Each structure stands twice: as structure tokens, then as C-alpha cells.
């Protein structure tokens, strides 16, 4: 039976050889030394193929959240629902206010009313003088 031992990676931060211990399925553990010249701030791992840089003094430290992913997702959805709900509530309230203010305004009189629509349709010139006295500015009424 074969046992698998987790691979270990040992590196130094200065220039020098790095040692790798890898596990194989046939229980033969080999230790290889690879002279890999790396800078003091660069460590390349053989298994991931990525270059990892240690955090520098100027970099920000990543926050460790005390909440699980589910709780964070629920918080985000709750905030989104609150924002969308507030927008919908404001639009609903503004529509209700607009409908209320329109009902307070007097409707236009029907076209059959006795109010003349234009000066061409006026039949009695004496009525137009009385109507014009209400619509003319004060200076013009005082002169006539």
C-alpha cells in the first residue's frame, strides 16, 4: 500500500539553493536541491507556479472578517434590498403626492361656457369692453 506524505517547501530569503521534498505514489521520497537564484523579496513555489511577494511595510494588511461568507452575502443582499426599497418607496410617495395635487386643481370649463375663446368669436362689443377692463393693466384703464 502506498502512503502519501504532504510536500514540504523550505526556502531561504537570501540568495542560495532551495530544497524541495516531494512525495511520490511509490513511497520513494526524494530530496532535490535546485540552485535557484532568487532575490531577497521573491519566493517561487514549484507546486503552484506563482511568484509570491511578502507584504512590504507600505502595503495594507488584509482584514480578517469575523463573519462567514453566508453572513456577508446576506448583509450585502440586505443593503441592496434596503436601497431598492427606499427608491421604490420614494417613487410611490411622489406619485401619490402628484395625484393628490392634480385633484386639487380646478378642471377647465367646458368649451360651451359663456367665456369667449378668442376676439373673433365675440358677438357683443360692449361685453368685450367690460372683459378687457379686467385684463388690461392698471395704466391703460386709467388713461381711457
Swiss-Prot record:
PROSITE patterns: GLYCOPHORIN_A. Residues 1-25, 33-48 have a biased composition (Polar residues). The chain crosses the membrane at residues 70-92. The modification Phosphoserine is found at residue 118. Keywords: Glycoprotein, Membrane, Phosphoprotein, Sialic acid, Transmembrane, Transmembrane helix. GO terms for cellular component: ankyrin-1 complex; plasma membrane. Residues 121-130 have a biased composition (Acidic residues). Homodimer. Component of the ankyrin-1 complex in the erythrocyte, composed of ANK1, RHCE, RHAG, SLC4A1, EPB42, GYPA, GYPB and AQP1. Interacts with SLC4A1; a GYPA monomer is bound at each end of the SLC4A1 dimer forming a heterotetramer. This is Glycophorin-A. It comes from Macaca fuscata fuscata (Japanese macaque). The gene is GYPA.
Amino acid at each position: 500500500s502506498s502512503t502519501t506524505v504532504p510536500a514540504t517547501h523550505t526556502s531561504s530569503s537570501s540568495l542560495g539553493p532551495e530544497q524541495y521534498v516531494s512525495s511520490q505514489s511509490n513511497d520513494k521520497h526524494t530530496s532535490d536541491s535546485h540552485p535557484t537564484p532568487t532575490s531577497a523579496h521573491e519566493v517561487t513555489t514549484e507546486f503552484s507556479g506563482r511568484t509570491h511577494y511578502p507584504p512590504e511595510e507600505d502595503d495594507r494588511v488584509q482584514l480578517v472578517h469575523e463573519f462567514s461568507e453566508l453572513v456577508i452575502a446576506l448583509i450585502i443582499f440586505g443593503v441592496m434590498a434596503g436601497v431598492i426599497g427606499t427608491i421604490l418607496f420614494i417613487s410611490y410617495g411622489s406619485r401619490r403626492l402628484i395625484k393628490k395635487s392634480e385633484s386639487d386643481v380646478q378642471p377647465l370649463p367646458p368649451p360651451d361656457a359663456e367665456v369667449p375663446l378668442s376676439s373673433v368669436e365675440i358677438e357683443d362689443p360692449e361685453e368685450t369692453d367690460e372683459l378687457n377692463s379686467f385684463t388690461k393693466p392698471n395704466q391703460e384703464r386709467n388713461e381711457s
